[in-house]
Curated annotation (Swiss-Prot):
Subcellular location: Cell membrane
Listed transmembrane segments: 6-26, 42-62, 71-91, 102-122, 134-154, 160-180, 202-222, 243-263, 286-306, 336-356, 358-378
Pfam families: MFS_1
Entry keyword set: Antibiotic resistance, Cell membrane, Membrane, Transmembrane, Transmembrane helix, Transport
One GO process term, biological-process aspect: response to antibiotic
Lineage: Bacteria, Bacillati, Bacillota, Bacilli, Bacillales
Function of the molecule: Energy-dependent efflux pump responsible for decreased drug accumulation in multi-drug-resistant cells. Probably uses a transmembrane proton gradient as the energy source. Causes the efflux of a variety of toxic substances, including such structurally diverse compounds as ethidium bromide, rhodamine and acridine dyes, tetraphenylphosphonium, puromycin, chloramphenicol, doxorubicin, and fluoroquinolone antibiotics.
GO molecular function, one term: transmembrane transporter activity
Membrane topology: Multi-pass membrane protein
Family to which the UniProt record says this protein belongs: Belongs to the major facilitator superfamily. TCR/Tet family.
Source organism (scientific name): Bacillus subtilis (strain 168)
Keyword RNA-binding belongs to the record: no
Key word Ribosomal protein present: no
GO CC annotations on file: plasma membrane
Protein name, per record: Multidrug resistance protein 1
Amino acid sequence: MEKKNITLTILLTNLFIAFLGIGLVIPVTPTIMNELHLSGTAVGYMVACFAITQLIVSPIAGRWVDRFGRKIMIVIGLLFFSVSEFLFGIGKTVEMLFISRMLGGISAAFIMPGVTAFIADITTIKTRPKALGYMSAAISTGFIIGPGIGGFLAEVHSRLPFFFAAAFALLAAILSILTLREPERNPENQEIKGQKTGFKRIFAPMYFIAFLIILISSFGLASFESLFALFVDHKFGFTASDIAIMITGGAIVGAITQVVLFDRFTRWFGEIHLIRYSLILSTSLVFLLTTVHSYVAILLVTVTVFVGFDLMRPAVTTYLSKIAGNEQGFAGGMNSMFTSIGNVFGPIIGGMLFDIDVNYPFYFATVTLAIGIALTIAWKAPAHLKAST
């Protein structure tokens, strides 16, 4: 057990380093866009090409995680990310930036299924929620710390954060090669008999509703998260520091919740009920954000709504990991794919609605998240999962 805890610590440290690199470039990306005189449409397509590439590659990467191993896929993903950030740092043309973002999408498609499958192999059904909560917290913490460091580095040179991000990813890849050993497949992740083969597995009853909820919730969450900064800027006149305080505050509270409460909540409620309650919380608060006006009220609602998001995401990942048996890579790849679909189309639809009325993207998010709540009411855990808990 101690050996597995050390392995988990190494894995989460490498994941933190990778997402620290992602966070580094957040403050300086608009500066690069202004330097190259890119339009809002070009930036939107650039964001979409990351998600589309991740969408296309995720199913393949998921299969490869099961076929070739967890460690090699994580390392490949980190190397792709390192190259992606380096190219963005040296990029002087739109074409180079698009290539960079596409490589970034490939890296995400490899890393996340590999990490979740790795964790499934070194944990038991009972200890997995805590480990996946730690995984989400490591990602959140990287996003929290990264922008602050990136803003400091950008004072030296606007391209420096991208080179540091590339170096961090390369460091994480080297550490993974040197310190991680390919895990033995967990005997608890038994083969589930009688399931559909190939992509027909998407429509298997134990997966289908989970994937639908991932898709629908990703639509709602992406439309909310991608336009939150514009919303509070246009509606309330918030400054960049105000927005940073709210997002950082939400991320900190969310990370603490994932570490301290997520494991307890999954034991008390189970994943399906926790997903439902998180969706109810998020749906209510996204709508409430369109009605509040005071700074303190907006701050409290924003911080709390991110807690709902940060509980739902690892709950879905934990549920999929528990039901997937020996198909951990497949489940992780599909999770990534359906999330990517939402990340592609949610911001596009939200952006169109924002041009009509600043509140409309949040109404749209409220409706889509409410559909997710309705789906959870009909959602039942498969028999083999009930038997194991």
